[in-house]
Amino acid sequence: MIWHVQNENFILDSTRIFMKAFHLLLFHGSFIFPECILIFGLILLLMIDSTSDQKDIPWLYFISSTSLVMSITALLFRWREEPMISFSGNFQTNNFNEIFQFLILLCSTLCIPLSVEYIECTEMAITEFLLFVLTATLGGMFLCGANDLITIFVAPECFSLCSYLLSGYTKRDVRSNEATTKYLLMGGASSSILVHGFSWLYGSSGGEIELQEIVNGLINTQMYNSPGISIALIFITVGIGFKLSPAPSHQWTPDVYEGSPTPVVAFLSVTSKVAASASATRIFDIPFYFSSNEWHLLLEILAILSMILGNLIAITQTSMKRMLAYSSIGQIGYVIIGIIVGDSNDGYASMITYMLFYISMNLGTFARIVSFGLRTGTDNIRDYAGLYTKDPFLALSSALCLLSLGGLPPLAGFFGKLHLFWCGWQAGLYFLVSIGLLTSVVSIYYYLKIIKLLMTGRNQEITPHVRNYRRSPLRSNNSIELSMIVCVIASTIPGISMNPIIAIAQDTLF
């Protein structure tokens, strides 16, 4: 009898929760229509996986890619609409947030074809992989539009939990398990630090959680210049720093990059930085409006440390993925310059443009690592020697992406860095820009060192891995080459038409 009563209560409670969720989607669904498309795609993936056999695997890729493309289309149709606040102030939709959401969706769309061959060769579970990627994408999109402290905490946790599972996806690999453990422990610690910072912000503002209401609360309580705000700023900067992985919050990055499956690293290397950058700009600009000098100083220190340590340590690496890990630490230092400049002098427009180029440059490089690793089973930089003699397309596309990452003209990376540094120079960040220029020269050195290995034709330098190199007979090889071609084109051609891209970003933002 008691069991029946408890069961009936559970059914009633579940029905109420479902009806409330349905009511929210019915009245607020138009505000999060791109996110709803991904949710529908997730449900469809689960239904197909539970009712089908192995023959329907191509449908899983098709549904995932289609839901991402449809979500991008929905965002484009909603472009430049009036800003909207929904879900009782928890979520905000505007052009600034939608640009970052577009970048996250673009990353995920490119990562799925990049992963097809790797999944087939390693016999990874396909459905779960796609579910985690789409759910992480969903968490990143919600983080971009988060308008209160609770959503800013919950959305990245949704992203982070999927990231932990993806990084440890190859359970039999000891390095993958080690990377996941470090990632999980440091991620949990950073989340605790972030919540502690939020608690100081919540208390100082008189119990407000919405970003704009926090500013009003700080004015009413006269706490905007109090020590509590400084403490909140430090803790929140450390918490967000884990997601952005600037130095000295970068310790997890090389190990996770090296131990995780390569398609997962490609996905995490760009989406986490895009989502964290969107969140950082909103948090620093709105609640810490009165502490701009303090957070500018903090971010300048992080940018300098990231650019110097990231690029110098990258020179010493022998693993391609570890080298890209330290390179990404240096790259986030350049992005922080745009965050510091802000609205003035087109800082946000230049930051967004550079991140768009960084997505193509980075994913193109990882596509090459996936392709080469599947054929040779190695990640060592020395083992790439002479690749041009066996696979000219792979070697040339790798060289173009690496040169663009280094910032050599006339590639997209050069013009992206040029505009970013010029905005920083106009804003008076002379020392920061000078460090950026010097470290860019350092990065060109280790990128050119890899390109020299790729193009070498001397037999004594060619390793057995390249001598025995064979192109994959799998039909899915076309998918990774497609991703690589798109990334190479996006890393080269946009440099020629830089001004229109910047103009579109400026016009959209302001």
From Swiss-Prot:
Keyword terms, alphabetized: Chloroplast, Membrane, NAD, NADP, Plastid, Plastoquinone, Quinone, Thylakoid, Translocase, Transmembrane, Transmembrane helix, Transport
Keyword Chloroplast on entry: yes
EC number(s) stated in the UniProt entry for this protein: 7.1.1.-
Coiled coil: none
One GO term of the biological process aspect: photosynthesis, light reaction
Membrane topology classification: Multi-pass membrane protein
MF (Gene Ontology): NADH dehydrogenase (ubiquinone) activity; quinone binding
Domain of life: Eukaryota
GO CC term (a single one): chloroplast thylakoid membrane
Enzyme class: translocase
Catalytic activity: a plastoquinone + NADH + (n+1) H(+)(in) = a plastoquinol + NAD(+) + n H(+)(out); a plastoquinone + NADPH + (n+1) H(+)(in) = a plastoquinol + NADP(+) + n H(+)(out)
Compartment(s) of residence: Plastid, Chloroplast thylakoid membrane
Transmembrane portions of the chain: 24-44, 57-77, 99-119, 124-144, 149-169, 183-203, 227-247, 295-315, 323-343, 347-367, 395-415, 418-438, 484-504
Family membership noted in the UniProt record: Belongs to the complex I subunit 2 family.
Function summary: NDH shuttles electrons from NAD(P)H:plastoquinone, via FMN and iron-sulfur (Fe-S) centers, to quinones in the photosynthetic chain and possibly in a chloroplast respiratory chain. The immediate electron acceptor for the enzyme in this species is believed to be plastoquinone. Couples the redox reaction to proton translocation, and thus conserves the redox energy in a proton gradient.
Oligomer status and interactors: NDH is composed of at least 16 different subunits, 5 of which are encoded in the nucleus.
PANTHER family noted in UniProt: NADH DEHYDROGENASE (PTHR22773)
Name used for this protein in its record: NAD(P)H-quinone oxidoreductase subunit 2 A, chloroplastic
Organism (species): Platanus occidentalis (Sycamore)
